[in-house]
Amino acid sequence: FLDVGCMSTKPDFKILSLDEEIIRLYFFIDNMSDKFYYSIDTLNPLVAERALDSGFLIINDVSGFVDSKMIDLAIKKECGVIVMHRNPGSENIHQKADYEDVVDQVNTHLIIQTENLIEKGVNRSQIAVDPGLGFGKKMEDSKELFFNLHNLINTYPIVVGYSRKKFTDQLNMTNNEMIDHCLDSGVDLLRLHLDN
């Protein structure tokens, strides 16, 4: 299973033009293998549609599906969707929020986000959720979430991406230990970089 992103979403990322993102996508499509399943990591519904038309099966939208066109596309294509947690008060995916109880609040927000998709017409069976480690969260909040993955909502498959996140430098854990922790906590899919 490969999650393909044509644009970085690191804290200092710059929005690519639609043309540039699609050029990068087509470069990958030209080299796709039928040995893998693919998801597209994008904020742009047009990029997501091109990917789905080329054999991708899942939209991984780190903005949390705030764009109604992305929701409409998921309904039209009946594809899988990975809904990443996003604080409803944030203006962008990396704006840090203040949490009193990060686990409880992330669960609450994910319930609101997924129920919104279902109300719009996305099938419940299409949905997986991602707590958004390192996105809009202080290091302590990401660490708290990481050690409480077993307390996340279990209504949907859980996707976790800790790879290359700064908070992991403070965990004193090897990559294999982090993988074991996630799997023991009930995580269904791990998003790792190729060098992991």
Label each PLM-derived region with a short phrase:
Residues 1-6:
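N-terminal glycine-rich anion-binding loops that anchor highly charged ligand groups
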Residues 50-51, 130:
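A generic short-segment signal for beta-strand/edge and adjacent turn/coil regions
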Residues 7-10, 130-132:
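Short linear capping/connector segments at secondary-structure termini
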Residues 9-33, 37, 45, 52, ...:
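Active-site-adjacent loop and "lid" segments of alpha/beta metabolic enzymes
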Residues 40:
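Conserved SAM-binding loop
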Residues 92-93, 113-140:
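Active-site rim beta-loop-alpha module in soluble metabolic enzymes
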